[in-house]
C-alpha cells in the first residue's frame, strides 16, 4: 500500500466512510483474481459510494487509460457485492487519484474522473486548518492526518 493510498483511505475513514482496502475481486478458477480494488468507501448518511485508484506512476495517459478502464470496470461489476445487505447507491463515484500529472487534457479516465494529489491536499487542509489541535485534535489512529493538522496550525512558521 502506497502513501497516497493510505492518505486517501484514512481521509475517507476520518469523515465517516466505511472503507475497504486492497480488495481482491473476481476469483479465477485457476487461481488468482481478476482485479484488486485499492480503496472503496461508503458513507451511509450521504449515500455516497466511491472507488479510488491512487497511483504515483509516471506512465503515459494511454497506459493509464488501459489500466483504469480495467480497474473501474471491475469496480462497477463487483463493488455492490462488497456491501451486501447495505443500501448502497447504484452510481459509483470512481476517481483516479494521481500524484503526478495534470488533468488539463485528461479530466476523465477509464470511465472515472481524474483527481490530483494537490486536490486531495486542498480538501484535507481546508477542513483541518479550521480545527485547533487544543480543542479538536485529529485522533492518533490517523497519524498522517494528524501530521497535516499540526502543519496547518503551524503554517506561518513553516512558510519561512
Across the structure, where does each feature detected by a protein language model lie?
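Intrinsically disordered, low-complexity Ser/Thr/Pro/Gly-rich regulatory segments
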Residues: 1-160
